[in-house]
Amino acid sequence: MRWNRRRWLGALLLVGPVGSGAYWWSGSRSAAADAPIKLVVSLSARELRVIEHGSTVVTYDVAVGRPSHPTPTGTFTTGDIEWNPSWTPPPTNWAANKKYQPPGAAANPMQAVKIYFQAPYYFIHGTNNPDSIGEAASHGCIRMVPEQASALARRIERAGGHATLVISP
């Protein structure tokens, strides 16, 4: 096989430098229409349903944004799935005194996986605070039991790497 500079450059641009924490997201609503998996989040019920071929295959209890930091509503396409992510406090007032958490750290609020869904800082991810599940406790992200977040991410990857995400009040 011959080395193809253009392909390698494209791969590097898509993935980013190793360890950069960069992610790629198409943001394409047309991609959402083609996604074989649909995730439906009810903020009031605090649950995430996974729908495949028109049928609910699994329902997870989740934590959602608190009233002061609500989870955005609408239709989204999930983007990059990052395994074993680090956590860098976002440049927001609530995170001003928080510290960087490396991958695998017990205090890392992302835990084993994060699934991007809305710019700039909204994810579906595991949690280091499982008691928050079923509550309005996050700063807008959708928190899951870590093992369930990993199972969801694997399901999305098997289905092509993206899903339609519908979040309703």
Regions found by a protein language model. Name each.
Residues 1-3:
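Secretory targeting signals
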Residues 5-10:
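N-terminal export leaders
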Residues 15-25:
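Hydrophobic alpha-helical membrane-insertion segments, chiefly the h-region
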Residues 21, 28-36, 73, 92-169:
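Exported/periplasmic cell-wall-interacting domains
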Residues 30-73:
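A structural motif detector for short, solvent-exposed N-terminal "entry" segments of globular domains
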Residues 44-46, 53-56, 65-67, 81-84, ...:
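Solvent-exposed coil/turn segments that connect beta secondary-structure elements
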Residues 51, 81-84, 152-159:
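Structured segments of extracytoplasmic/periplasmic soluble domains
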